[in-house]
């Protein structure tokens, strides 16, 4: 059985491999997802300038106050990041799942962002 440390090393290698091919621009920035055991974080990044344009996480007070499950929190983070992005005029993004499988919390965040108006 693969240990937790080895799983994270494999994820980081996968993420590095994908990042060589994937980057965000000002017209189509990158939506990056980081998942910890308890929280989930999302940022929209312009890699050309090297700056974060928008961020949302399950630690935000308005998101964390009334959710019970981690999948519900991920859905709310996806909706929040899409709302903040539309306020900044961002409609199209490149989705970077951070080496995680497109399943569970990562999938919930992505689908909520899509339903809230982001295109990817």
UniProtKB/Swiss-Prot annotation:
Record's keyword terms, sorted: Ribonucleoprotein, Ribosomal protein, RNA-binding, rRNA-binding
Subunit structure: Part of the 50S ribosomal subunit; part of the 5S rRNA/L5/L18/L25 subcomplex. Contacts the 5S and 23S rRNAs.
Keyword presence, Ribosomal protein: yes
Molecular function, one GO term: structural constituent of ribosome
BP GO terms, sorted: translation
Organism field: Staphylococcus haemolyticus (strain JCSC1435)
Function: This is one of the proteins that bind and probably mediate the attachment of the 5S RNA into the large ribosomal subunit, where it forms part of the central protuberance.
Protein name: Large ribosomal subunit protein uL18
Entry similarity comment: Belongs to the universal ribosomal protein uL18 family.
Domain of life: Bacteria
Matches recorded under InterPro entries: Ribosomal_uL18_bac-type, Ribosomal_uL18_bac/euk
Entry keyword RNA-binding: yes
GO CC terms: cytosolic large ribosomal subunit
């Amino acid at each position: 059985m693969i240990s937790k440390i080895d799983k994270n090393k494999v994820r980081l290698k996968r993420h590095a491999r994908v990042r060589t091919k994937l980057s965000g621009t000002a017209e189509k920035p990158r939506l990056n997802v980081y998942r910890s055991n308890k929280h989930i974080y999302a940022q929209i990044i312009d890699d050309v300038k090297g700056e974060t344009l928008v961020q949302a996480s399950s630690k935000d007070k308005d998101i964390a106050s009334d959710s019970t499950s981690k999948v519900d929190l991920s859905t709310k983070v996806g909706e929040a990041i899409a709302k903040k992005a539309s306020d900044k005029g961002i409609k199209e993004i490149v989705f970077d799942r951070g080496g995680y499988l497109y399943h569970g919390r990562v999938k919930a965040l992505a689908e909520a962002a899509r339903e809230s108006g982001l295109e990817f």
